Amino acid sequence: MSAQQFKYLFTPIKIGPFTVKNRIMVSPHGPLMGELGLPTEEFIHYEINKAKGGAGWVCMSVGYTSPRDTWFMRPNGGHFDRHIWTWQKEIIPGFKKIADGVHEYGARCSFQLYSINLGNKKGPSCIPDCNFADQMWEPMTKEDIKEYLDYHRICCENVMAAGFDGIDIHNHSGVCTDFLSASINKRTDEYGGSLENRARLLMETIEVTRKVVGKNKAIGYTLTVDDLLPGSIVPDEAVQLAKMLDKDKKVDYMFCGVGRETQSMHMYFGPHYLAPAYQMYAVEQIKEVVKNIPIVAVGRINDPLLAESLIAEGKTDIVAMARPLIADPELPNKAKEGRLDDIRPCMGDNLNCVKYMMDGQPIRCICNATVGMEHMGWGIGDMKKAATKKKVVVVGGGPAGLEAARVAALRGHDVTLYEKAKELGGQALQAEMLPGREEMGGLVRWQKIQLPQAGVKIVTGTAVTSDMILKMNPKPDVVIVATGAEWMRNAFSGQSTAEVVGWQQDNVFTPSDVILGKAKIGKKAVIWDARQDITAIAIAEILADKGCQVEILAPTPFVGSLDQIKDVT
């Protein structure tokens, strides 16, 4: 597809008082790059880089709204420390840098506010805490509600003082979401019962926001169409709520999605086991009834061609991307220029983005090593040629070796890459053979296109030895060894590095043995999930499909990774 064939994706759209240059929005996500609640240079440049890459609207997150929002507090700070404490006026100088930087590239920006029920100690009703079942929420009093609204107002004022173009109201968890949920909100006053009553706090939140931002700025709202919990937020009620918000344009644009950050996380942060655009069933229901404000679709819309088709078919007005723009913030510009093969793919693995976030660490990307390094000279267009051209030899054609070769060549070096196998890819070739993991080969496929363009000479089917390197003429100035790793047959016994007893037996195999068909498996198999990622579950699926009775053992109360796992029931 040429750039001219994008008839909709790069057309302007009206959002509130603004005309936005295209239909690509950065979906709000918390990169956890703050420090003591303040935006760092890492955070500032990370966000500006999205505008530099061509996105029309950069929506940022996570902004806690009250000192009592301490649910994520950890001994080392964790989530709470690294998210933004939006009630502090001290955020304004850093936020102004972001707003100025985003505007420099012709984009607009907003910030998403997120209140966690006054420190997750209080909620709509007296029910067990949704994250800590041994704790009970206290019902929020009218004074508590006033406190929440007062802090929300202060946060809006701070964001507006920094020159942002809008405020977003989060609704995939938090206080407004819980008040909307019939399974959580058991109140009998004006904030409980009917949908209109359960939506009252949301409407008051929007009213407070509008009083601060006025008509010259925009308000966005994240509508949970289906939170996938029994008796909670369901599509029928979400449609009614959307109509209420559409009337009189109470908000200026509306994200539509499914899932809850905690209880239905596998749908909220959909991994590659879920189809691209898997949330569109929810988005389309809202698009049918909302007539006055733009609808924003989310949920693994990871390809500009897919985004174009969704808009062309009238299923949405705008597409929001988070992980695809982490993997390649230049996706919008590259698509507009018709350079689709140059777009670095998001593989939907969730390994360094979602998992790092859930661990309370700044996010990174398994496909893009520059994430979080933009302030150190690794932003878009910042790479400089080396002062001295060198002869570089890279040994190993897996993802790491391919990336080292690509970057070295782009910096002007003479690069030759050697791989002993006939095919490039290393362990990624096995990863993409696992059930549902076909996208795991995406990075290597992209690298295979990029290396020749960068001028890398590739030699496959050649095992490199030290003698071979010593005899090279001319001798290399630099040798990069990227030979990867292989599965340990002796494994780990659990919480220590002690070997598994009996690993020398003939019936003990590695995942590679199974994937490559080298393992002789009988009718029963036991899998030891020492790594605690998706591998054990995927191997179990392979064996079960062959009629094998499988049992998985793990050192923790669950198998696999909570951040990558699909429904294993």
List each language-model region with its residue ranges:
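Rossmann-like dinucleotide/flavin-binding elements
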Residues: 305, 386-418, 459-472, 482-565
